[in-house]
Structure formats: structure tokens, C-alpha cells
Amino acid sequence: MPKGGTFTKKRKAARRCLLDVANALTGDDIQEDALIVSTSGRYEFRNKGIDVFIEAMNRLRFDESLQKQVVAFIEVPGCTAGPRQELAERLDSGRQFDTPLDMPVLTHWLHNMDDDNVLNRLRTLGMNNAKDDRVKLVFVPCYLTGDDGILNMSYYDLVLGNDLCVYPSYYEPWGYTPLEAIAFKVPCITTDLAGFGLWANTEKGAYSEIEDGVKVLHRTDYNYSEVADAIKDTVAKYSAF
């Protein structure tokens, strides 16, 4: 884990990378103080809570209490066909852009564009990173090993650029991603269906809150909508910190 000045330098570089990707994709003016939020892990659409993360970001678009722009990233490896050449060219130019690319939600092409769960859910919800959307969502469907052709940073370097990580698991025996987030000084949201969430609650003696560094949500088979709202509300609250 980087410390001191090295941590600050790496966090700044990661934020710059993420904000530049968002601008190059969407053509929107992404503010320097935009709140960067992400979820990551294996591509298990329901078990990892990717579905409810997308739903929460969709609801956040219409939340009037939101104090900042939000750029949300889904970082899960899919059936990747390779980096988008036109996106790579924009990033290599070092310029800022005011027009979007086609499909301004996706960093790498997929072999299964018509069948991908994330893309289909974004289409259903009408989440296409329109100019007036205060919440942008970017799908990064590749392993972050530092040579993906777009971000070109490892996961552990990139996670430093986040302001908040969200792991709303439906099933997770332990959950290393939230543990790694807080190890890198990034607050996170998880659930009590993850072992890490249960541990955080046990340590506090009550449900852990975002002010503690880990927000633990109660999740059951029947409260999907409530979990989506709780994520939305926590991100909106965090935007005012």
C-alpha cells in the first residue's frame, strides 16, 4: 500500500485516468471534483450485486439532493473483444472532447454485445450518458492488469482514484473487494450477506455506517428496491461531505 506523497501521487494519477476516460467516451465536461464510484469483481450479475448497483445509479440520476457529478464504473471482466480504437485515439491525443462516441458507456468491445447483462440493463433503463445526466456510468469489461489498451493501470493502482466503492453482494462468503478498498483508504458499501459486512457489524456492535468507513446494508431475498434506494441515498449523502 503506497504511503504519504506516493499515495497522493498515485491517487491523483488514477483520478486523472478515470476522468479522462469518462470525458473521451461521453464528450461531457466532467468536473475535477466529480465523485468517482465503482463496483468490481467477478462478472456475477446478481450475486455480486451488479444489477442493484446499476439500479441505484439510475435512481441517483433523478435525486435532487445530489451535490456533485458522479462517474460510476463497473469493472468486471466480460467477453472482451478488445479495446475501442477510437477511444484509445482520443485518450492518446490528450485533448478534451465535447461530442460523445457511439455507445458512450463502454470502454472495450464485447463478443456478445446483444446478450451482455450490463449493456442490456443499461438499454432497458435508458442509461446512455446523455449530456444532462449528472450520473455517468462506464462499463469496463476487462481485467485491469495494466495493459488493457484503454486505462492501462492495474486494479490496485486504479482503485486509489475512487471516492467510494460499492459491493452490494447478494451472496459472498467473505468479500475481499471491500477489504481491499478500505485498505487503500476508500470507503465502501457492502451488505450483511457478505462475510466482511458481518465482520464489520460485529466489530462495531451495530450496523456499520459510511462515517465508519464501511456502510453495511441489510439485504434479503425481498428488499432489492430498498437496497437500491439505500445505495442511492448513501452516495448522495457522501457527495455532500
Regions found by a protein language model. Give the residues of each.
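Catalytic cores of carbohydrate-active enzymes across secretory and cytosolic contexts
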Residues: 1-241
